Amino acid sequence: MRVKCSISEDVETLINQQIKKEAHSSAIYLGMASWCARNGYEGAAAYFFKQADEERDHQMKFFKYVLDMGGNAVTPEISNIKQEYNSFREVFEEALEQEISVTQSIKNIAARCQKENDFLTLDFLNWFFKEQREEEIKARRAVELFDVIGEEGTGRWQIDKAVGAISYNSEA
């Protein structure tokens, strides 16, 4: 039953797709954490466990928003999560690609909201844009470590230790 929902069905559908994308991202990060832990990269595993938690938090924010606006939030089914990677670097390259994909998906919701003059949802999305900027910067920095430090000798060990220290401060 839809009683005075404050978002359109199109926006609701897009947000439900985003809920699934966030849940999928969380599961991807758990798979990455598992691979890293199994391969001795404990720092990276901890980094990806944290990322998985953050993605689930994002999923829940979207889920609650749909409900708060009188819509129907859909619990997503998640499958086909990658568990194996060819290299330590590949894990981080795919994490960056995932963050860029999430950002693009949120942009698509915002574009639809702009078209519909749905300023409440646009305001809600602003938090996610700031969050995604941070997530992309951190993921990009992790990939850059492979070029800065290199993988030879103790390079991967140093990268594993450095990943946990990556932070972002938006204050100039």
Description of each model-found segment:
Residues 1-172:
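Iron-associated oxidoreductase/ferritin-like identity signal
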